């Protein structure tokens, strides 16, 4: 539906022409923050989004490879929300660049939508060593354009969608012969399986997925598992 709307230049419409006096601050521009801003703006509320990163989108931008969610689609959806009159202020970390108390004074309401950017940990010895990442942190680094040294062997622990994303992204990076994410078309993330698929695209790379249960019990989408194996 979203692609259909963007292709045809459809725009969101407000539900009222009344401009309300109550101002709302939204902390975070991920799915929750953008959704709240959209709903409030349609109802006539002046909304300002405060985003800590230099681009809006949250996990949509930094946790999903662009092969799943292309940047132009995400940018188009966000632009449609901003066109409702929503103000966006990036590189504004609440608690550093502006205090929460200041927001409370300037706005009638504050919606906190800071998201969940921390990945799950195994709580085992060695997981804090160099070269060990959670899927969330790894995909964030890649999508942010950070350089990541992968080496020739990658192991993805887990059987979910994020794993696949991480694997596939790794392979694409290795295939380009660079750890710079901005030199290849990054892909959106379904955490564990995706990582393995990316790593395997490199002819010289070795990628393995370790999962504690059986293949049939893997939570990743079935066709994603098959595509990862084909790669």
Language-model features: locations:
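Residues forming the flavin
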Residues: 2-231
């Amino acid at each position: 539906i979203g692609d259909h709307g963007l292709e045809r230049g459809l725009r969101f419409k407000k539900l009222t022409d009344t401009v309300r006096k109550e101002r709302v601050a939204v902390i975070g521009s991920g799915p929750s923050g953008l959704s709240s801003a959209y709903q409030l703006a349609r109802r006539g509320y002046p909304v300002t989004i405060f985003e800590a990163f230099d681009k809006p989108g949250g996990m949509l931008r930094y946790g999903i490879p662009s092969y799943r969610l292309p940047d132009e689609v995400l940018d188009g959806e966000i632009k449609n929300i901003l066109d409702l009159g929503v103000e966006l202020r990036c590189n504004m970390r609440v608690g550093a660049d502006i205090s929460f108390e200041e927001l409370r004074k300037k706005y009638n309401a504050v919606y906190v939508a800071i998201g969940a950017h921390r990945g799950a940990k195994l709580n085992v010895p060695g997981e804090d060593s160099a070269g060990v990442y959670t899927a969330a942190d790894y995909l964030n680094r890649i999508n942010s354009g950070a350089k990541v040294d992968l080496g020739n062997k990658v192991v993805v622990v887990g059987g979910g969608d994020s794993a696949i994303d991480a694997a596939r992204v790794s392979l694409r990076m290795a295939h380009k012969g660079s750890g710079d994410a901005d030199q290849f078309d990054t892909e959106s993330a379904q955490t564990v399986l995706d990582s393995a698929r990316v790593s395997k695209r490199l002819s010289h790379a070795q990628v393995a997925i370790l999962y504690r249960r059986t293949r049939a019990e893997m939570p990743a989408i079935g066709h994603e598992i098959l595509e990862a194996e084909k790669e």
